[in-house]
Amino acid sequence: FMENGTGKTAWLDGQRSLIDAEKQDVLQWVMVGGEGFLKPAPDGTERLAYHVVRRDCYNVLARGPRGITDVLMSERSRAGSDYYTLLERRTVDGSGYLTIRYKLYVSENSSTLGHEVRLDSLPQYAALAPEHTYSVPFGGLGMTYIRLPMANNVDGSPDGVSVYEGAVQLIHNIYKNEYQLGREF
């Protein structure tokens, strides 16, 4: 525990403020998709920027006893008439070492992945190394995993489900009842 007013305390307070600024977006996307990540990324200063990784932007590739151990994320962007997809794979091995791999693809349309190009093809990805394994055990994916609701009451799988999923049948029944009542009166 740190004393108030130290440099580390001020830095942590700044990070907490940055996370607080993202919490509404995080909560909304996690409720819609059932789960998601809050991902820290260097912003070019001494701070981290935090980004929401929505459920439709990643695939879980493996799980271990303590949660997700392998995930593939995608980020889409457009430059001129080309469509770019950055694939980021984060894998944690059995000893807790985190490896991050990046690949960039370009396509002439938004419906195909296209072919692989160099990471420096787009300026925002030029500083990324194609692969990096941390030299000390990281113990996780380096992101905060958030899941709402905690229990999957739809199919019992380890995947998250939208908080709205359980209400779908109820909403259909309400519409049906309203339709029937509207026809009678």
Show which residues each predicted segment covers.
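Structured, mid-chain assembly/scaffold modules that mediate subunit interfaces
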Residues: F1-V136
